[in-house]
Amino acid sequence: MAAADGALPEAAALEQPAELPASVRASIERKRQRALMLRQARLAARPYSATAAAATGGMANVKAAPKIIDTGGGFILEEEEEEEQKIGKVVHQPGPVMEFDYVICEECGKEFMDSYLMNHFDLPTCDNCRDADDKHKLITKTEAKQEYLLKDCDLEKREPPLKFIVKKNPHHSQWGDMKLYLKLQIVKRSLEVWGSQEALEEAKEVRQENREKMKQKKFDKKVKELRRAVRSSVWKRETIVHQHEYGPEENLEDDMYRKTCTMCGHELTYEKM
């Protein structure tokens, strides 16, 4: 009895099919896909056979039965003698092996795939080497134009256009968004425009002198207008008709009298009849 019980698990193990290895399953799948491709190609080569036979009154060329081929992978193929041989000779080249596009950091020389400066400013610098407070500092568009004497065309139209990021104004939220540029790229672009640092400094000095001259000119104009306003007010006061206010009259001699204006000192002499 015990021997019979021990034989049952062994018989059950023999009845269960063994699982095929992964390589065998992959080979079977490739052969199945190839069989489907050959069948589709054969059908596409003669899509109008029934229609052509009906058009010729039922007369059609009768071909021999297709050749049956055992692929050895569990599939049976019906292969035309000439057409399938041509299709079978087609060799598909394997696709290229995709490799990661690594970028070399210009600071440390190490390879990296992604970084903040590379994504936003096309600067090959990894996040570990990023110096946000000094070398890789960001400046506003207004500061770039005032400090480095750049115009809008120098930033946006000169090749290559400089990249920037847009952020809300932290001081005035109701104002428009700020455009922030990489200071390192702004300095490089200013040297391209002005040629050298010395030429840039000379241009800044000339612009500062012109700005001071304009301020002095505006100041002189305001002083001139103020003087003109004062003179015109004095002239207007002088043109007003003066009304004399005479004091008591004085008797000079026979029937002659005199009185003096208390405001301007004008003397009026007259005779009483």
From Swiss-Prot:
<feature type="modified residue" description="Phosphoserine">
    <location>
        <position position="196"/>
    </location>
</feature>
<dbReference type="InterPro" id="IPR000465">
    <property type="entry name" value="XPA/RAD14"/>
</dbReference>
<keyword id="KW-0832">Ubl conjugation</keyword>
<comment type="similarity">
    <text>Belongs to the XPA family.</text>
</comment>
<dbReference type="GO" id="GO:0042803">
    <property type="term" value="F:protein homodimerization activity"/>
</dbReference>
<keyword id="KW-0539">Nucleus</keyword>
<keyword id="KW-1017">Isopeptide bond</keyword>
<dbReference type="GO" id="GO:0006284">
    <property type="term" value="P:base-excision repair"/>
</dbReference>
<feature type="modified residue" description="N-acetylalanine">
    <location>
        <position position="2"/>
    </location>
</feature>
<dbReference type="Pfam" id="PF05181">
    <property type="entry name" value="XPA_C"/>
</dbReference>
<feature type="cross-link" description="Glycyl lysine isopeptide (Lys-Gly) (interchain with G-Cter in SUMO2)">
    <location>
        <position position="145"/>
    </location>
</feature>
<dbReference type="GO" id="GO:0006281">
    <property type="term" value="P:DNA repair"/>
</dbReference>
<dbReference type="GO" id="GO:0060261">
    <property type="term" value="P:positive regulation of transcription initiation by RNA polymerase II"/>
</dbReference>
<keyword id="KW-0863">Zinc-finger</keyword>
<dbReference type="GO" id="GO:0016604">
    <property type="term" value="C:nuclear body"/>
</dbReference>
<keyword id="KW-0227">DNA damage</keyword>
<dbReference type="GO" id="GO:0006289">
    <property type="term" value="P:nucleotide-excision repair"/>
</dbReference>
<feature type="binding site">
    <location>
        <position position="129"/>
    </location>
    <ligand>
        <name>Zn(2+)</name>
    </ligand>
</feature>
<feature type="cross-link" description="Glycyl lysine isopeptide (Lys-Gly) (interchain with G-Cter in SUMO2)">
    <location>
        <position position="63"/>
    </location>
</feature>
<dbReference type="InterPro" id="IPR022652">
    <property type="entry name" value="Znf_XPA_CS"/>
</dbReference>
<keyword id="KW-0225">Disease variant</keyword>
<dbReference type="GO" id="GO:0009650">
    <property type="term" value="P:UV protection"/>
</dbReference>
<dbReference type="GO" id="GO:0009636">
    <property type="term" value="P:response to toxic substance"/>
</dbReference>
<feature type="binding site">
    <location>
        <position position="108"/>
    </location>
    <ligand>
        <name>Zn(2+)</name>
    </ligand>
</feature>
<dbReference type="GO" id="GO:0008270">
    <property type="term" value="F:zinc ion binding"/>
</dbReference>
<dbReference type="GO" id="GO:0005829">
    <property type="term" value="C:cytosol"/>
</dbReference>
<dbReference type="GO" id="GO:0005654">
    <property type="term" value="C:nucleoplasm"/>
</dbReference>
<dbReference type="GO" id="GO:1901255">
    <property type="term" value="P:nucleotide-excision repair involved in interstrand cross-link repair"/>
</dbReference>
<dbReference type="GO" id="GO:0003684">
    <property type="term" value="F:damaged DNA binding"/>
</dbReference>
<dbReference type="GO" id="GO:0006979">
    <property type="term" value="P:response to oxidative stress"/>
</dbReference>
<dbReference type="GO" id="GO:0005634">
    <property type="term" value="C:nucleus"/>
</dbReference>
<dbReference type="GO" id="GO:0019904">
    <property type="term" value="F:protein domain specific binding"/>
</dbReference>
<comment type="function">
    <text>Involved in DNA nucleotide excision repair (NER). Initiates repair by binding to damaged sites with various affinities, depending on the photoproduct and the transcriptional state of the region. Required for UV-induced CHEK1 phosphorylation and the recruitment of CEP164 to cyclobutane pyrimidine dimmers (CPD), sites of DNA damage after UV irradiation. During NER stimulates the 5'-3' helicase activity of XPD/ERCC2 and the DNA translocase activity of XPB/ERCC3.</text>
</comment>
<dbReference type="GO" id="GO:0010506">
    <property type="term" value="P:regulation of autophagy"/>
</dbReference>
<dbReference type="GO" id="GO:0070914">
    <property type="term" value="P:UV-damage excision repair"/>
</dbReference>
<keyword id="KW-0479">Metal-binding</keyword>
<feature type="binding site">
    <location>
        <position position="105"/>
    </location>
    <ligand>
        <name>Zn(2+)</name>
    </ligand>
</feature>
<feature type="cross-link" description="Glycyl lysine isopeptide (Lys-Gly) (interchain with G-Cter in SUMO2)">
    <location>
        <position position="86"/>
    </location>
</feature>
<comment type="subunit">
    <text>Interacts with GPN1. Interacts with RPA1 and RPA2; the interaction is direct and associates XPA with the RPA complex. Interacts (via N-terminus) with CEP164 upon UV irradiation. Interacts with HERC2. During NER binds XPD/ERCC2 and XPB/ERCC3 of transcription factor IIH (TFIIH), bridging the 2 proteins.</text>
</comment>
<feature type="binding site">
    <location>
        <position position="126"/>
    </location>
    <ligand>
        <name>Zn(2+)</name>
    </ligand>
</feature>
<protein>
    <recommendedName>
        <fullName>DNA repair protein complementing XP-A cells</fullName>
    </recommendedName>
</protein>
<dbReference type="Pfam" id="PF01286">
    <property type="entry name" value="XPA_N"/>
</dbReference>
